[in-house]
Amino acid sequence: MFIDSAKIYVKAGDGGKGCVSFRHEKFVPKGGPDGGDGGTGGSIFVKADANLATLLDFRYQRHYKAERGEHGQGSRKTGRSAKDVIIKVPVGTIVKDSETGEPLADLVYAGQEVLIAKGGHGGKGNQHFATPTNRAPRYSEPAGVGEERNIDLELKLLADIGLVGFPNAGKSTLISTISAARPKIANYPFTTLEPNLGIVRYAEYQSFVVADIPGIIEGASEGKGLGLKFLKHIERTKVLAILIPADTEDVQAEYDTLIEELRKFDESLCLKPRIVVLSKMDLVLEDASFEVPAFEGEKVVQISSVTGTGLQELKDVLWRIIQESNQQEESIT
């Protein structure tokens, strides 16, 4: 099961109390204050883990609390600070405050770690409050309270290529052919009910990631079909591969509808590099009337996942576009 959103509650630890204490030593009848400071409460962090792929674990554990710091002690002993809590999430997770909607973290690379709830500071012991007029203070500083908040987690797939097409366009077949991914495949719409990731080995030490996005239908930008739930995953891809079956009734109309749904959802998607992939070419080889539409001058690659025709060309084209996209990103940064 692919879980792409979750809600959790986090509570950082309170600080330890400062100590009120006085020296008790032989031959020192009126020892001064020696109350130690309290320890710091544990903070809570989120950390991106490349070994995680879903937010499923958060269905079973929704509350995360860090321990408080230990209280200060006499003889100027500082209380021990509490350990921090690290919450591991998949790469690509966005973290927001549930009440305010404030973005707290966008975890885009493995090992990235962000503080989401800070532990309370330890209270100062009475040793800090002695003055010439009050040499025996009988008070200490209160401990700080650890932050608490409700958190929204949202996972958006990180992939180089996003396969976009109507249900039953052949996306799952293609990704299973060019990568090691094994998505469920059947001859009916909406077989893919969750995004699949496949790693395509292009050459030695060279590879790229393809996301098989569940099928879009007309009205998806308004929530129809699988709708908005999966359109958002396209936002994180570098390149869009518009997959259209060559045997569809009106190839150009299908292309126009897909582009329009992307535009309605987010116009910036139409600015991404993209190519058109005509799939199932083996079904129209003997159709003399078949013509490849212009597709507004887009690069078109004709393939058949069944016969293997055009697959190497497709990988070559995708690899080249990815490299061009990476170079553009580097020049901007």
Swiss-Prot record:
EC number(s) given by UniProt: 3.6.5.-
Pfam hit, one: MMR_HSR1
Annotated compartments: Cytoplasm
Residues the record lists as binding Mg(2+): S172, T192
Disulfide bond annotation, renumbered to this chain: none
One Gene Ontology term of the molecular function aspect: magnesium ion binding
CDD domains xrefs: Obg
Xref: InterPro entries: G_OBG (IPR031167), GTP-bd (IPR006073), GTP-bd_Obg/CgtA (IPR014100), GTP1-OBG_CS (IPR006074), GTP1_OBG_dom (IPR006169), GTP1_OBG_dom_sf (IPR036726), OBG_GTPase (IPR045086), P-loop_NTPase (IPR027417)
PROSITE patterns for this protein: G_OBG (PS51710), GTP1_OBG (PS00905), OBG (PS51883)
Functional description taken from the UniProt entry: An essential GTPase which binds GTP, GDP and possibly (p)ppGpp with moderate affinity, with high nucleotide exchange rates and a fairly low GTP hydrolysis rate. Plays a role in control of the cell cycle, stress response, ribosome biogenesis and in those bacteria that undergo differentiation, in morphogenesis control.
Family: Belongs to the TRAFAC class OBG-HflX-like GTPase superfamily. OBG GTPase family.
Subunit structure: Monomer.
Identification of the protein by name: GTPase Obg
Annotated source species: Chloroherpeton thalassium (strain ATCC 35110 / GB-78)
Encoding gene per record: obg
